[in-house]
Design a protein with these regions (language model features):
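Conserved S-adenosyl-L-methionine
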Residues: 169-174, 273-275
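Phosphate/diphosphate ligand-binding glycine-rich loop within oxidoreductases
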Residues: 27-142
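Glycine-rich adenosine-cofactor-binding loop
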Residues: 38, 129, 148-169
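Adenosine-phosphate binding glycine-rich loop
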Residues: 252-253, 257-312
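NAD(P)-binding Rossmann-fold cofactor-contacting core
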Residues: 172-198
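Short helix-loop-beta connector
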Residues: 144-149, 250
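Rossmann-like adenosine-cofactor binding region
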Residues: 201-277
Length: 312
């Protein structure tokens, strides 16, 4: 009927008005800009995640993704100051490239020489690395503390290095790192020395991942087994660094940084053996939450809401 159609039109106009009002509230002459620096970035869910949080907490901020060429990284970092941005996240392949342009680095970022979050503190650019914090925060959300624990870590690339330094800083008793003995081995040895300097009480050891006997012994000895390499994600979703599931035991905690698939072969087999497991999606969300806490000076990201909105 005409009355019914008019009611629908009125509702649409009202909704459009609310949307326009919401847009005016989000963007103004005082809106503070934040962003993502990397390449490629079109696939990133960071803008949706952070802008959701800004709306939720009525923050006059906006977050955009910037696809930056390698020769534009320095200019992009300088723009954070020039445009009075609150900060920026940094993704591949520029986590190490931005380091020389920071005014200050946190201990974790300094140790591994990699930055994934830049915070503009009144014109001083502070480089953080929240990957390691995301890992330990995800464990904490699952009732697990790393202090005093013996940890076996498989993979010591960018994410693995972040995890290694963070668990050492948070008081892990022992950390056994396994990595392929490839061209990156010398740089891993340097990282181990850097970690020892900032966390001398953590007993560190480095092993070739090809040494299955050493890996078996480490898994038998440790409290937490963490996978931090690409094994488990496509096209290796049917693979695991632990070839023999009999190595698992019910009192072992098994974690994986891979978040797609949400449950890797490693985690499936560990869970079947009675282990407590933690997947990579929680770490991904927690490292973003740590960055939001830094940007917002202490606000807590609604992690469960973000997961339901973007990943479920």
């Amino acid at each position: 009927t005409a009355a019914f159609n008019q009611t629908i039109r009125n509702k649409k106009f009202a909704a459009a008005g609310r949307q326009e009002e919401e847009t005016r509230m989000q963007l103004s002459g005082t809106t503070t800009l934040l962003g993502l620096i990397g390449s490629p970035v079109a696939h990133s869910k960071s803008p949706a995640m952070y802008n959701y949080c800004f709306r939720k907490f009525n923050m006059d901020c906006a977050y955009l993704a910037f696809d930056v060429a390698a020769d534009q990284v320095e200019q992009s970092v300088k723009a954070i100051k020039t445009l009075h941005m609150r900060g920026a996240n940094v993704t591949m392949p520029f986590k190490t490239t931005v380091v020389p342009y920071m005014d200050r680095l946190t201990p974790a970022a300094e140790t591994i020489q990699a930055v994934n979050t830049i915070v503009n503190e009144d014109g001083v650019l502070v480089g953080h690395n929240t990957d390691g914090c995301g890992y330990t925060q995800n464990l904490r959300r699952n009732g697990i503390e790393v202090a005093g624990k013996k940890i076996t870590l498989i993979g010591c690339g960018g994410v693995g290095s972040s995890i290694a330094v963070q668990v050492a800083l948070e008081g892990a008793a022992e950390l056994a790192i396994f990595n392929l003995k490839d061209k990156f081995w010398p740089s891993i040895e340097e990282r181990m020395e850097a970690i020892h300097k900032v966390a001398p009480n953590c007993v560190l050891s480095l092993h070739d991942l090809a040494d299955q006997d050493a890996l078996h012994a480490a898994v038998d000895h440790c409290d937490i087994l963490s996978n931090a390499n690409m094994v488990g994600m496509p096209p290796m979703e049917n693979m695991s660094n632990i070839k023999d599931p009999s190595w698992f035991r019910p009192d072992l905690i098994v974690t994986d940084v891979v978040y797609s698939p949400t449950e890797t072969k490693l985690l499936r087999e560990a869970k079947a053996a009675g282990c407590k497991t933690c997947g990579g999606l929680g770490m991904l969300l927690c490292q973003g939450a740590e960055a939001f806490r830094l940007y917002s000076k202490g606000l807590e990201m609604p992690i469960d809401e973000i997961q339901a909105l973007l990943y479920d």
